């Protein structure tokens, strides 16, 4: 009888996890061409040959109401996965993101003697820090995108490996600004500002008016300023268009459909909501200002829970305020415009900022897929 192939269990719960999982499978195939991959997968992981017991869509729920409605089904799936992985006894189990689902599953499997990895650290360094103890009990290794995440886990003696960020691998150290401008129809000599008011309905509602009023002030300072606004989907575009007509109908703004990365590369500066967009903007080598608002009660709660001095990833990576953050009441058109003006006009300030962006990019550009694969192999061979 032939020996059983190396078997790796994987669970991904959303599109970003499906992308990471597919990259991990590709990298592992380079070392283990006969390996078997089973679990919960999206279309990209299945295209790499993974056997899906459940489709990823089963786990992809958003919002409290939907989670409550789907909770019995989610709990049944987790119990079934626990049973099936326990019976199969994979050589290693990898939970990809979706921490509320996967970390509990990892803990159950680890108690049954199955080695486990959690791929993508939750933001325990920022809030709900006591989760680190549950993670430590549940996993044999955490794979972290960012170096300060590993430093946090080290403080609690929880095994963690910094593998770099897949987004940093995907983007050039020296983006082609001329090509991006040509693709978007922006003149090489024009000043260009990108506005990115977020991907969520609530973000576009809270930020768009202030962002547009800031852009109006900058247009007065820099006549002919090109203003581009990439929007993530038709719903956000329609929402933004409604606000534009109400707030700044005369402002010459060009709306783009889901071309955020090209807009960042093409722009001289960007005004954006916090989140992964700030990291992507740094990797695009585009100077930025971060503006963010939320409902007062939510902000008050966040201030009590969040333990970091900054919210944007460039600042967290640099360990200082590299990028201006204007949050809540500070997120006013006058302040936003004042922070953006030197980024559009001061070549020395821009050059210093871009040099730092490039340095930080190099720091997290580590071939994350391959690093993750090697971490999995190390655990299998331990």
From Swiss-Prot:
Catalytic class of the enzyme: transferase
Pathway, per record: Glycolipid biosynthesis; lipid IV(A) biosynthesis; lipid IV(A) from (3R)-3-hydroxytetradecanoyl-[acyl-carrier-protein] and UDP-N-acetyl-alpha-D-glucosamine: step 5/6
GO BP terms, alphabetized: lipid A biosynthetic process
InterPro entries found in the cross-reference section: Glyco_trans_19
Keyword annotations: Glycosyltransferase, Lipid A biosynthesis, Lipid biosynthesis, Lipid metabolism, Transferase
Pfam families reported in the protein's UniProt record: LpxB (PF02684)
Gene Ontology MF, one: lipid-A-disaccharide synthase activity
Catalytic activity reported: 2-N,3-O-bis[(3R)-3-hydroxytetradecanoyl]-alpha-D-glucosaminyl 1-phosphate + UDP-2-N,3-O-bis[(3R)-3-hydroxytetradecanoyl]-alpha-D-glucosamine = lipid A disaccharide (E. coli) + UDP + H(+); a lipid X + a UDP-2-N,3-O-bis[(3R)-3-hydroxyacyl]-alpha-D-glucosamine = a lipid A disaccharide + UDP + H(+)
Gene Ontology CC, one term: membrane
EC number: 2.4.1.182
NCBIfam families, alphabetized: lpxB
Summary of the function given for this chain in its UniProt record: Condensation of UDP-2,3-diacylglucosamine and 2,3-diacylglucosamine-1-phosphate to form lipid A disaccharide, a precursor of lipid A, a phosphorylated glycolipid that anchors the lipopolysaccharide to the outer membrane of the cell.
Entry similarity comment: Belongs to the LpxB family.
Protein name (database record): Lipid-A-disaccharide synthase
Lineage: Bacteria, Pseudomonadati, Pseudomonadota, Gammaproteobacteria, Enterobacterales
């Amino acid at each position: 009888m032939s020996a059983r192939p190396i078997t790796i269990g994987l669970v991904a719960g959303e599109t970003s996890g499906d992308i990471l999982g597919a990259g991990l499978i590709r990298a592992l195939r380079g070392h283990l061409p006969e390996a078997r991959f089973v679990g919960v997968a999206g279309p990209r992981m299945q295209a790499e040959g993974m056997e899906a017991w459940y489709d990823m869509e089963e786990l992809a729920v958003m919002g409290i109401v939907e989670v409550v409605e789907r909770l019995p089904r989610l709990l049944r799936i987790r119990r079934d996965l626990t049973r099936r992985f326990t019976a199969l006894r994979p050589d290693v189990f990898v939970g990809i993101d979706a921490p509320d689902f996967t970390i509990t599953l990892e803990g159950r499997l680890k108690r049954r003697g199955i080695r486990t990895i959690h791929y993508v650290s939750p933001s325990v360094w920022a809030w709900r820090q006591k989760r680190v103890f549950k993670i430590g009990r549940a996993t044999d290794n955490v794979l972290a995108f960012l170096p300060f995440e590993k430093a946090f886990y080290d403080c609690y003696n929880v095994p963690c490996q910094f593998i770099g960020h897949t987004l940093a691998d995907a983007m050039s150290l020296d983006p082609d600004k001329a090509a991006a401008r040509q693709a978007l129809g922006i003149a090489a000599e024009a000043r260009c500002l990108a506005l990115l008011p977020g991907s969520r309905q609530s973000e576009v509602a809270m930020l768009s008016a202030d962002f547009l009023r800031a852009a109006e002030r900058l247009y007065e300072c820099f006549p002919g300023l090109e203003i581009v606004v990439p929007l993530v989907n038709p719903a956000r575009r329609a929402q933004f268009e409604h606000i534009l007509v109400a707030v700044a109908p005369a402002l010459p703004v060009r709306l783009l459909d889901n071309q955020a990365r090209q807009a960042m590369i093409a722009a001289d500066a960007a005004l954006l909501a916090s989140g992964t967009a700030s990291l992507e903007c740094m990797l695009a080598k585009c100077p930025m200002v971060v503006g963010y608002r939320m409902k007062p009660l939510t902000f008050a709660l966040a201030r009590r829970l969040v333990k970091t001095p900054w919210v944007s990833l460039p600042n967290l990576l640099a360990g200082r305020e590299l990028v201006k953050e204007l949050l809540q009441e500070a997120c006013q058109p006058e302040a936003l415009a004042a922070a953006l003006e030197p980024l559009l006009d001061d070549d020395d300030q821009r050059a210093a900022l871009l040099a730092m962006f490039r340095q930080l990019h190099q720091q997290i550009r580590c071939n994350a897929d391959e690093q993750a694969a090697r971490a999995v192999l190390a655990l299998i061979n331990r």
